Each structure stands twice: as structure tokens, then as C-alpha cells.
Amino acid sequence: MTAETRIHELRAELDQHNYRYYVLDEPSVPDAEYDRLFNELKALEAEHPHLVTPDSPTQRVGGEALSAFSQVRHEVPMLSLGNAFEETDLREFGRRVVEGLDQPGAVDYSCKPKLDGLAVSLLYRDGQLVQGATRGDGTTGEDISANVRTVRNIPLKLQGEGWPAVLEVRGEVYMSKAGFDRLNAAQAEAGGKTFANPRNAAAGSLRQLDSKITASRPLEFCCYGVGQVSESIGDSHIGVLEQLKAWGMPISRELRHAAGIEECLAYYRDIGERRNSLPYEIDGVVFKVNNLAAQRELGFRAREPRWAIAHKFPAMEELTEVLDVEFQVGRTGAVTPVARLKPVKVAGVTVSNATLHNMDEIARLGLRIGDTVIIRRAGDVIPQVMQVVLERRPDDARPVEVPSACPVCGSQVERTQLVKRSKGKETTSEGAVYRCVGRLACGAQLKQAIIHYVSRRAMDIDGLGEKSVEQLVDEGLIGSPADLYKLAFEQIVGLEGFAEVSSKKLLDAIEASKRPSLARFIYALGIPDVGEETAKVLARSLGSLARVQQALPQVLTYLPDIGLEVAYEIHNFFEDEHNQKVIEQLLASGMKLQDEGELAAEFAASTTLAGMIAKLDIASVGPTGAEKLVAKLDSLEKIIAADGIDLRQALAAKQADAVREFFKDEANQKLARDIEAQLLAFGMHWSCEKKVAEGLPLAGQTWVLTGTLERMSRDIAKDKLESLGAKVAGSVSGKTHCVVAGPGAGSKLAKASELGVKVLDEDAFVTFLAEQGIVV
């Protein structure tokens, strides 16, 4: 037998032993025999180095150290999950799923423990592991290929056959409790750093630049799903996981089906009771709608899937003493109390600070400085004060007082009453917030505003980290975001961290930031409660900064996922004279927003008179009543002028009286007319609806999306089609105009072929969009 033949035999045998040991939990040989085979292979490869291949079991020991990790863009974003902390949260999730699917019978869910580790992506091409990456921010992660190759139960080559040419496997790298204990014991014996908990140990081990260190750590991998795949590998989530297991991927041994939310709750309770006896740390349970077609139908909300949720376990709690309460100043000027605690370990982490949120929370707790309190890590991450232990209160405990002057700049601190709004009306009190009135004259607010403005997801000005921003502010070089565009080379060269080359690069990055998208610019402004997704909705729907600035709160609620609270935050931000001045300065610096344009067509055609009436919050008049009213009185002016007789012909007496009473108030008349006038000015008034719809190229057509699209998500594809006037349906029928089919298309594609419906693959679809002036 040749050395090459024996090497191939040994690799195949060792791969099979690894599969049986790590995936099936059925060891086929004693450890000593495995070690003998491994050492034989290692010796043969040393004698014949030209026969060493990347997928050999001997190549898990690590290679040369890296200087830094390179970035990897996820073709399919690695989204985070929404959380449920109470049974009511999970039941509400179940209700939304049932409502979204509109199907009879219990929904089938997959259930598994939520490992407390680090999410990673493993990319296989033709069965070979070619890349490993961290989750990062969900869009961009770090290339940790060398490190994941050292994790013992990650197959370097897939088992069996039939795997797709491209297969991205996603899962969690973690450290078992036993492995963690062994690692810490070894670290302590060697005089090295010990880790607070298994998650920190796993994360720190996986992100080592020297993969030899990673190889020495007891890391494990558990698969929980897939990302990009070149062809379908199943029609259910559990089916996909079972197929991955057949190809050598370790999956959770606790994976189960559940028929409906009550069975999910039973699973959650069972895992919770066994939590401490499990060989690994978990912080909850993950439930996913099992049927993949149902997942696609439910889709996503912002950066979370609507078909999955993580039900978290209650956090671990400890007692400690409040040594002091200090006040921090945030980006919006909010003065927030923070408890300084006698250090205590909670769930393996030393906690010395805890959030107190606001003064109302301090009042609710009855907290005083010197008190003994119960703290917990909410969601196992953020320390919170839960309760004061009154029987341990010392005689010298002191009440907490809000500073009258800002602890940073000395400006006055004002108390602002918060209110909960209901469709334009101020209702119940939501407590109060204390704010420093110094705005950008306050160093803390200015620094946080600039840090947010230059961040990667905002204006993406490379070279300006927190320390650099603090230095520029402390040196008096910037007093607002607009001052960044006035910086000169001579001002920054020589500052700490800025040599000639880095100074030039920073100025180039600042100049490059003058061409942002509208969404980035809106997000960079730091509007309270406006994150990336909301900024994208504003930009995509309204199309221009001017419309966003002018929009009334009630008009903003017509946009997807924007409620009245957020709408008022947006409106109030742009009404503020100081903010207007900052925006004027930014635009005067040469800022050119790159994608301003018209109102989104689907948004322009989405409003109706009935919808507007329903949003006015007239007592007892909901969407159905509004439809009845508009069927009788087809204009706002007719409704305002209607007497009781006209109104009672459309509505029940109680509703008719409510409408008449509402419009007796001149302020309500003005509000309704202002809303209508703005809708008309924006081109989204119902009188424009027919004209807008008829003028779109796909008006009256029904399209269907199926399979996995690689160049865009299905939600984005749906938005593109709807912007052209098409209706996007979930099933194929004789009325379907066209089907867009990506890899993995199944029954819908077959149905289209059967009915003779036109089918476009993704390339043809992208070409079609380009012909309509839409670039992907």
C-alpha cells in the first residue's frame, strides 16, 4: 500500500470517528485507538508534506498568527431574534404568527435551547469548508476561518453526498461547563488570565489572532440553521437540521417539535428545570415556525424575523450595597442616574455599576444611597437594580437628589414631563426626564453626538473613534457635527494619534462623507428613537429631506412601523430651531444627499379618506366605521359639514354623535385639514391614488416570489415590484402575471409551469428592474 493510499484511508477513518463521536454521540473506538490513528497520519504527512491537504484532521492545530481580522460581508444578513421575557410575551408572539399565517390548526414550531456562545457562519463550497466568520453587526463580520478550522466538531469536509455547491451553515461556538472549568484551572496554574464565564471564554478564544491559541481551547460548535444555499435542502427547519446532521454537522440533542404555543411553553419549562444539569450554559429557548414556506410568508420586521423568538430565562440575582448614585449625560441631554455598587459577581461577571433608568425608577424602588439591593443582569447582560432590602437599610442612608446643574458643563438641568400620545392627543403621564439644556455646548452631549454622527452605520468617517472625538472636542476644534467639515490639516496633525498620513486619511474620509444616502444622513442626525431601519423607512417612503422635515406626526404614521410616539419625536426634532440650524450648517458645508427623489409610489397610493378618519381617534369610530362614513360622505369637507341626520344615515347613533362632536372643535377641524393638505402636497392624497396607480408600469399585475434570491432579500424584491404598481401575492393562480424564481423554488414554480405563467430567474428579474430604472 502506498503512503498516499494509507493517508486517504486514515483521513476517512478519522473523519468517520469524529462524526460518530461529536455528532452521533456514539464513539466507535477508544480514545487511545483514535490517538494512534491520528499520530500515524501525522507521521505519514510529515514524511510526505506534498500530500498534506487543508481538510486533513491534522490541520486543526492552527497556523501562523494574523495581524488583524479581515471583514466578511454576509450575503444573507445574520439577524438577531426578538425576545420574550414572560409567558405573555410568547403568547403574543404566537398570536401574531397565527394572525400572519391565517391558517387553521396549531402552528408547528421547532424548539431548542439558546446556547450562550458566539454566533458564527461556516461557508462550504463543494463540501469543503472555505470560510468562517463572526456575526458582527449582522451585515459584516470578521473572517475567523483559521480559528474555526481548529474547532474539533466542525467538519472540514462534509460527510455523505448530495450537498449543495454552496452551503452556508450557521450556529453557535460555545464552551461546555466542564471545558470552561478545565481551561480556567489550566490558566490559573500557568499564571494566566482566567475567564468570568463560558461565553466570554468562547468569544475570547475564537477571536484570537493566533489560531494555535484557539486550537488549545475546548471549543464546540452547534448548528442552528443556514444562510445562503445554492439549492433547497428541505421544506422545514427541523428537516434542514436533520439533513445537516447527516452531512456531519452537530445539532442540538434537545431539538424538538411543538404543536402550538402551549407546547412551546411546556418545552420552555422543561428546559428551565433541567438548565443547571445541562453540560453547557444557556440563557433561554429559541422557537421557530418550522415550515419554511410559512417563514417566508411571515417575513421580517426591521432586523428581526417575525417567525422566530428567543424566550429568555430569568436572570440570576445577587445582593450588594449601593455606594453612590452618579449622573451621566447622554447624547440627547438626558441626565441618567447610575448606581455605583460594591462589586459582586452575578452569573460569573463582576458587577460594580447598574442602570437606574430615571428618577421615577428611583422613586418606585424607594432607593437611597447606602441601601442593600437585589441586582440582576437583565437578559443576562445589563445589570439592573430590582429591589431594595428595606430591613437592611442603615441609619445614615441618604436620599438621591437630581443635580440642578449639569455635572459636565454646569448648564441648568430641566425636568420635562413625558406624555403618552394617542393619535394626536396627550393622555396619561409617562413620568419625567431630566435634561441638560446645554445641547452642543455641553461636552458630554457634543461628544456623544459626534461619535454617533461619524459611526460606521451613520456617516462612516473612518479614523474618528471615541478617543479621537473626545480629543477634538477637548481641544476646541469642533463644536458641532458641521465643524468636522471645517477641520484643516494644520489643526489636527500632531495631535495624539494623528501623524501626517493619518491626518490626510481623516480629512479624505470627512470629504467622502459629503455624499451620503438620505437614510444615512437621517440616522446620523441622532433623532431620538430613530434607528437605522426607521431612517430607511423615512428615506424610502418620503424620498427627500424636505418632506421628512415638513411631515406632520399624523402623516408620519402612514409609514410602515412608525407609531405616533416615534412620529412626534421626528416632528419635534425638526421643529427645534437649534436642530434646524445644525442641519443648515451641514448642508452649507457641501453636503449632497445622493438618492433624493420622488415619493415612493406604493406609499403615495396607500392612503384613503377612511384611513385618515380612522387615525383621527374619534371615539368609537374605527376602520369599519370610517369606511361606512366615507361610503356616504366622500370628502373631508362633507364630513366636517355634515349634520346629525347625514351622519346617522352612515353610522350608528353613538358613532354619528361622536363624529359631530369631534368636528365641532375648530382645533380638530384644523388638524384634519392640515393633514389632508399635506397629503395632497406630498402627492399621497386619495384623489391622487387612481392616477398614481394607473401610471405605474405593473399596475393591475400580480407577481409571485419563490425560492432564495441571492442579490437581494425577498422583502426588497417585493418593495421593488410594489413601487412599480404590482401586487405581490403568496400563491400562484391563473391570475398571476409572472413568477420570480430563485434557487430552491418548489411548488410555486411547478404550479407556474403547469398554468403556463411567465417565469423569470433572478438575473432576468434584475435585468427587468434595470429596464424600469431600478438598479439593484
From Swiss-Prot:
GO terms for molecular function: DNA binding; DNA ligase (NAD+) activity; metal ion binding. DNA ligase that catalyzes the formation of phosphodiester linkages between 5'-phosphoryl and 3'-hydroxyl groups in double-stranded DNA using NAD as a coenzyme and as the energy source for the reaction. It is essential for DNA replication and repair of damaged DNA. Residues 693-776 form the BRCT domain. The gene is ligA. Zn(2+) binds at residues 406, 409, 436, 442. Pfam families: BRCT, DNA_ligase_aden, DNA_ligase_OB, HHH_2, HHH_5, Nlig-Ia. Gene3D superfamilies: 5' to 3' exonuclease, C-terminal subdomain, 6.20.10.30, BRCT domain, DNA ligase/mRNA capping enzyme, Helix hairpin bin, Nucleic acid-binding proteins. It comes from Pseudomonas putida (strain GB-1). NAD(+) binds at residues 31-35, 80-81, 135, 172, 288, 312. InterPro entries: BRCT_dom (IPR001357), BRCT_dom_sf (IPR036420), DisA/LigA_HHH (IPR041663), DNA_ligase (IPR001679), DNA_ligase_AS (IPR018239), DNA_ligase_CS (IPR033136), DNAligase_adenylation (IPR013839), DNAligase_N (IPR013840). Keywords: DNA damage, DNA repair, DNA replication, Ligase, Magnesium, Manganese, Metal-binding, NAD, Zinc. GO terms for biological process: DNA repair; DNA replication. This is DNA ligase. Its EC number is 6.5.1.2. The active site is at 114 (n6-amp-lysine intermediate). Belongs to the NAD-dependent DNA ligase family. LigA subfamily. It is an enzyme of class 6 (ligase). One of its GO terms (cellular component) is cytosol. Its cofactor is Mg(2+); Mn(2+). It catalyses: NAD(+) + (deoxyribonucleotide)n-3'-hydroxyl + 5'-phospho-(deoxyribonucleotide)m = (deoxyribonucleotide)n+m + AMP + beta-nicotinamide D-nucleotide.
